């Protein structure tokens, strides 16, 4: 649908000097780390990760180790957004499962330490891929990368949320209806101009939600660039801000937007040459691991997923407007609300 939704590794990977509006004094953080992390040593360097438009994320280098600090952004925020406390809770709960997540060291809800609530976790060494075409990889490596990320989301949806203490992490049932309502409210709260396709989707979606219902832990934003790879295996899943209890197929379909949003992913012959599975092949991989039939209502979940990411993009534009965006690249991501909403409505017109 749009080449603008494609991201570039060099632009978003690695760290940079902390943006002026996101700087904080390290003294109180040092005291907090001393109280919560044994043997860390003194803070030597604080850097900001280039990626991550939502919650500002920092690399904290000390004498003996490196850590990642993730905090709420300063300023006016949307209701229930930037929930670092929920991120901390789910990452901590999943640490002993087959889902690869970093070890957490603590949650701090005292604004006086760095200015907003934050949590600290281990720094996971590896590679984050922002370009879904994986231009620096061989066909065999690409196939392995896609196979392994499929395995991880299947593992996540197979975790018994009750056994890991997340029975209170969200409501059970009616996930999609609640999500449509939530993202509609978030979209309208951050609306910067009238978009006809979004208005039509807001009216159409609640009337066409499938009756099937099941509940699992869902990530909410399971993308290639929210994973850390080492030797082409996933060693860390990041950015759990949107996670909750929800519908696994909705979560997986959102993950599959790559095949609908990037032009090169429409060319099956090219994907085959590159070692990348096409949409149906990737969908079948998930079905084989989970036993779930994804053929029914797949297009509805695609429409819902496109609507959701369009609303996320609008939220980014809202933060740009309000001056609270965490990245200088925020606006170029936010403007994708236009092609994404048009793409979603075109599927409605073609299939319903």
Describe the predicted segments one by one.
Residues 217-219, 224:
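Catalytic-loop of the protein kinase fold
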Residues 170-171, 293-305:
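All-alpha amphipathic helical-bundle segments outside canonical DNA-binding/catalytic cores
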Residues 238-243:
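Activation of the activation-loop gatekeeper triad in protein kinase-fold domains
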Residues 294, 311-352:
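Helical subdomain adjoining the active site within ATP-dependent kinase catalytic cores
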Residues 250-290, 304-323:
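Active-site activation/catalytic loop segments of kinase-like enzymes and analogous catalytic loops
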Residues 43-217, 233:
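ATP-binding pocket architecture of kinase catalytic cores
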Residues 2-39:
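Juxta-kinase regulatory segment immediately upstream of eukaryotic protein kinase catalytic domains
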């Amino acid at each position: 649908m749009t080449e603008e939704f494609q991201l570039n590794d060099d632009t978003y990977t690695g760290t940079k000097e902390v943006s002026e509006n996101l700087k904080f004094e390290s003294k109180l953080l040092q005291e907090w780390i001393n109280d919560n992390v044994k043997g860390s040593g003194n803070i030597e360097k604080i850097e900001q990760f280039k990626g991550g438009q939502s919650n500002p994320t920092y690399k904290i280098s000390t004498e003996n180790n490196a850590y990642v600090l993730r905090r709420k952004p300063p300023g006016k925020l949307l209701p229930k957004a930037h929930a670092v406390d929920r991120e901390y809770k789910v990452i901590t709960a999943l640490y002993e499962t087959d889902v690869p997540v970093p070890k957490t060291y603590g949650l701090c809800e005292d604004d006086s330490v760095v200015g907003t609530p934050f949590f600290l976790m281990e720094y996971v060494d590896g590679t984050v891929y922002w370009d879904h075409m994986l231009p620096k990889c061989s066909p065999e490596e690409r196939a392995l990368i896609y196979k392994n990320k499929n395995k991880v989301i299947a593992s996540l949806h197979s975790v018994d949320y009750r056994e890991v203490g997340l029975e209170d992490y969200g409501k059970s049932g009616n996930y999609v209806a609640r999500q449509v309502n939530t993202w509609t409210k978030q979209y309208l709260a951050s609306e910067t101009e009238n978009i006809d396709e979004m208005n039509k989707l807001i009216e159409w979606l609640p009337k066409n939600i499938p009756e099937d219902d099941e509940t699992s832990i869902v990530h909410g934003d399971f993308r290639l660039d929210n994973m850390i790879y080492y030797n082409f295996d996933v060693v860390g899943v990041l950015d759990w801000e949107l996670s909750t209890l929800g519908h696994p197929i909705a979560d997986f379909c959102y993950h599959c937007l790559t095949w609908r949003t990037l032009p090169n992913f429409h060319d099956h012959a090219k994907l085959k040459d590159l070692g990348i599975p096409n949409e149906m092949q990737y969908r079948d991989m998930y079905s084989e691991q989970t036993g779930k039939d994804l053929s029914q209502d797949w297009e509805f979940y695609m429409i819902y997923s496109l609507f959701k990411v369009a609303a996320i993009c609008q939220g980014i534009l809202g933060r740009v407007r309000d001056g609270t965006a965490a990245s200088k690249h925020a606006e170029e991501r936010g403007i994708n609300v236009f092609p994404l909403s048009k793409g979603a409505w075109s599927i409605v017109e073609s299939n319903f």
